[in-house]
């Protein structure tokens, strides 16, 4: 059988072409235009990039807590180092014991292993209650057991080195970096200097620095007395332990400098202690860092609402707090799966909800389609700063301008006032003085009024009031009904008795019978009359014919 030539495009190339065609059909994302919405009490406060992440990258940082002194200065630093060593052991022994109990719980197989595992967790938690997060942390600790054992196998060489930071790769299944914040101090102060220091000064310097580091360790592990092995360490705590050397590990894990500051603020970089050795004062921490994917065509837009003035009172716009826009599609974004930073939104999944046509039209700039709720009270903050200018409801608060002096009044029916440096340089609101530097250009809509049909009831108190009005209307209707019943009761009861009703029915039937008979009789008489008319007409015609015949003769 002859083979046919194939013209199929390879799968990777097909995917690239499909992606390119898809992107070419999607218009580049532009943030929501807040200029037509500001005067309606809807303020766009900012945008954030939307990223997808998964916590898949792990590495280990080995903290060398006890520094190695130069040989010629060991005697001078012996006393503070011994005191520091004893304090370290006292502080971190509960942590090491907790880690060992959990890791040793996997030595038994089957159901007994599961019971020992849960028992070890509960034994490490105050009040005997283990949360799901603590059980997850314990599972991660079990998985890192082999890596911790490999690190302990190298503990002597790690403790003996004078390097402040170096990679440890011998026999380890994941990236590990040994760091020593105190070793860095010793290297900077004593190893790399030609200055001669007396023994007393060396003792003082080492003692002060060790005490400061102990304070940081107490700050890191102090809140973990109840469950020291199951509480994740924050990125701030990790930096306290490792100093600036922490950046080396994060860079090795693939965290770029452009993402580092944002990820630090997100709290997604965490660490869990996996080992502590009191002999060499080695502390092992497993670092979890997210793997981040950028969604270049998506951003989150944050919206805030002001209490605006309407003819029905104060009200606020019914719009989502966060929306996302891709091309011409605008949908509400659920941020419950996301971690926020100043510039980014890191999400494990993207969940959006479609908006009603009215809200979509409202956010697109058609303020007459916006709906408002009478749920804002008089104590709600009636102003908001936006790019050096102020949007304020000057009917709820006094907008006092100090430069030039005067009171800014809000026109009747106007929802809010847009105040910039052209109308006031220094503005006072509720005792707060603001110097304005921004401006609302001609693209901002002003003097927007909210119609009565745009204000609806959504608050519990307002709904209760409306229900009260409905109840009053029902009560009035019941009163009218009772009044009607009382008037009916005054009528003659005999007229409405059963015998009277029977009499009425009989008379009605008789009347109908007489009516039918009369109709039949009338029809008969009309028929008879027409028959007589036909007879007379026939006789008349015959007589006329006879007379015509006689005349001809």
UniProtKB/Swiss-Prot annotation:
InterPro entries recorded: Fusion_F0_Paramyxovir (IPR000776)
Residue ranges that the Swiss-Prot or TrEMBL entry lists as coiled coil: 142-170, 466-491
Membrane-topology descriptor: Single-pass type I membrane protein; Single-pass membrane protein
Keyword vocabulary terms for this entry: Cleavage on pair of basic residues, Coiled coil, Disulfide bond, Fusion of virus membrane with host cell membrane, Fusion of virus membrane with host membrane, Glycoprotein, Host cell membrane, Host membrane, Lipoprotein, Membrane, Palmitate, Signal, Transmembrane, Transmembrane helix, Viral envelope protein, Viral penetration into host cytoplasm, Virion, Virus entry into host cell
Region (Fusion peptide): 117-141
Extracellular side: 32-500
Gene3D superfamilies named among the record's database cross-references: 1.10.287.2480, 6.10.10.110, Head and neck region of the ectodomain of NDV fusion glycoprotein, Newcastle disease virus like domain
One GO-annotated biological process of the protein: fusion of virus membrane with host plasma membrane
Transmembrane spans: 501-521
Domain of life: Viruses
Cysteines engaged in disulfide bonds, as pairs: 76-199, 338-347, 362-370, 394-399, 401-424
Record PTM text: The inactive precursor F0 is glycosylated and proteolytically cleaved into F1 and F2 to be functionally active. The cleavage is mediated by cellular proteases during the transport and maturation of the polypeptide.
Site description Cleavage, residues in chain: 116-117
N-terminal signal peptide: 1-31
Lipid-carrying residues in chain (S-palmitoyl cysteine): 523
Chief localization: virion
Compartments in which it is found: Virion membrane; Host cell membrane
Residues carrying covalently attached carbohydrate according to the record: 85, 191, 366, 447, 471
Description of how the protein assembles with itself and partners: Homotrimer of disulfide-linked F1-F2.
Name used for this protein in its record: Fusion glycoprotein F0
Organism expressing this protein natively: Newcastle disease virus (strain Italien/45)
